[in-house]
Amino acid sequence: MGSFSIWHWLVVLAIVVLVFGTKKLRNLGSDLGGAVRGFKEGMKGAEEENTQPPPSHQQVTGHSIKSEIEEKDQTKV
């Protein structure tokens, strides 16, 4: 009485198929698979957010001192 044999599980499966039908079982399986996939993508997104370095607060300009000096020299000529 402690464990079920393969025949017990086959009878239970047959009753479930008769009660719910194969279409509902297929929809249930695809819904469950979609939920698992969404959960995995959500966890992947959370891991990517944690691994990205925080943005720096320094503002970097595109000009260097050398280019500013060259611009001043060109305006003098």
Swiss-Prot record:
Task: Provide the topology term for how it sits in the membrane.
Answer: Single-pass membrane protein
Q: Which GO terms describe its molecular function?
A: protein transmembrane transporter activity
Report TM segments: 1-21
A GO-annotated cellular component: TAT protein transport complex
The alphabetical list of record keywords is: Cell inner membrane, Cell membrane, Membrane, Protein transport, Translocation, Transmembrane, Transmembrane helix, Transport
Classification via Gene3D superfamilies: 1.20.5.3310
Name the GO terms of the biological process aspect: protein transport by the Tat complex
This chain belongs to the protein called Sec-independent protein translocase protein TatA
